[in-house]
Amino acid sequence: MLTQQLGVLHASGARGFFVPGNHDWDSMQPGGWDAIRRQERFLAATGGGATLLPAGGCPGPVVVDVGQVVRLVALDTQWWLQEGPRPAGPTSSCPTRSESAVIDSVRGALRSAGQRVVVVVGHHPPVSGGVHGGHFGWQDHIFPLRNIKPWLWIPLPLIGSVYPIARAEGISSQDIPSRAYGRMRAALDSAFAGSPPLIYAAGHEHTLQVIAGTSTRYVLVSGTGTFGHIDRVTALDSTRFARSASGFMRVEFLSDGRARLGVIIVDHAGNAAEEFGLWLN
């Protein structure tokens, strides 16, 4: 899959940033830190303008300025949730070695942005109407095995409710209701409070969501770049757009700082069309 993504990037001639998530960290396995460093070496070996941000398993933030118009602030949010080895403490070679140092650096990156529009990118969204947000449908309660294999339509009423209820109660650190995830959200909210970014862009959920944020103007969840790999989604009170469909999002920045979002849906024939558009500022 990574090779296919790189092929698209190389063909376009664009500069690409890969922001790590839980799967890049080998799904929280003890060897996750080694896995993310192997991926970094692979990207470097392919050339063509692909960069892992942040690198080395470091939490970030890494700041990339695009002239005087846009400031990109990249975070490795899995660093906060990783249960195995990670670069932290006095032995770490990362610029930020603790959670408090990360937050201080994020706060500084926002305050020093000047007139630039700030976009924060991190794999895990702060809010979501998807399964990681604890939102499950009736099918999850009746046919829970479909979360393992989509074709396992085996009804397990009552017993099947154990899985979605446990997820909604935060049994997994990859879910928003969990204690570890909540601590990360609260820390980032405190960093954003003084100078809220325009956009927090995330993946994690296999959905397309545009949500009006609290500590950030908009939360963009775009996680269906792999065709057919989609999950259900629930519209929240703050949702501006939500779809369970394959596609991606595009944000265009004008020289005067205005930003326009386009949500692109892709069909089985490979045709792409904008289904939702919004001026963000």
Language model: regions and residue ranges:
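Extracytoplasmic/periplasmic solute-binding protein
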Residues: 123
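A short C-terminal boundary segment appended to hydrolase-like catalytic domains
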Residues: 212-215, 239-281
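The feature captures the conserved acid-bearing segment of alpha/beta-hydrolase catalytic domains
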Residues: 181
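Conserved active-site segments centered on acidic
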Residues: 204
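Extracytoplasmic
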Residues: 176
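Active-site neighborhood of glycoside hydrolase catalytic domains
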Residues: 188-189
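Extended active-site neighborhood of metal-dependent phosphoesterases/phosphodiesterases
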Residues: 1-118, 129-172, 193-199, 207-243, ...
